[in-house]
């Protein structure tokens, strides 16, 4: 799923932020994202899940919030892989979904959640990001 009103054709990104849930990129590195965009860099975000197991809000609310954050920050691209929240695996099928996004945008730099994080999805997401980048 892509955020509407963005031109995704032939979009080479300087930086691609990979996040387990909608709002992770904003909470973890929005200052960095804004700084990079102000420097003229093309920055995008790929959210792995819709955050459907989150205790605050619904997937629909999270989608609307991420679309609004995309506009406010001036992101050049944002996609959601719609992987099952809480239970996603770092397996071949999931890696290939992410590889498709990586090859589409050909980022020079990738940012992801920390490998060691209080939230288990963040660590799993970081490992998925690392593995997909090397396929």
Task: Give the ranges of each region predicted by the language model.
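Active-site rim/loop-helix segments in enzyme catalytic domains that contact anionic ligands
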Residues: 1-105
């Amino acid at each position: 799923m892509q955020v509407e009103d963005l031109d995704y054709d032939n979009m080479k990104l300087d930086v691609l932020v990979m996040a387990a849930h909608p709002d992770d990129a904003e909470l973890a590195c929005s200052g960095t994202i804004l700084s990079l965009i102000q420097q003229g860099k093309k920055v995008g975000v790929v959210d792995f899940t819709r955050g459907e197991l989150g205790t605050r809000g619904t997937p629909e609310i999270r989608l609307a919030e991420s679309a609004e954050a995309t506009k406010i920050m001036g992101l050049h691209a944002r996609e959601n892989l719609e992987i099952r929240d809480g239970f996603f695996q770092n397996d071949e099928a999931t890696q290939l979904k992410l590889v498709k996004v990586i090859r589409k945008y050909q980022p020079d730099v990738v940012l992801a959640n920390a490998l060691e994080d209080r939230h288990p999805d963040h660590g799993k997401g970081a490992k998925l990001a690392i593995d997909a980048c090397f396929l």
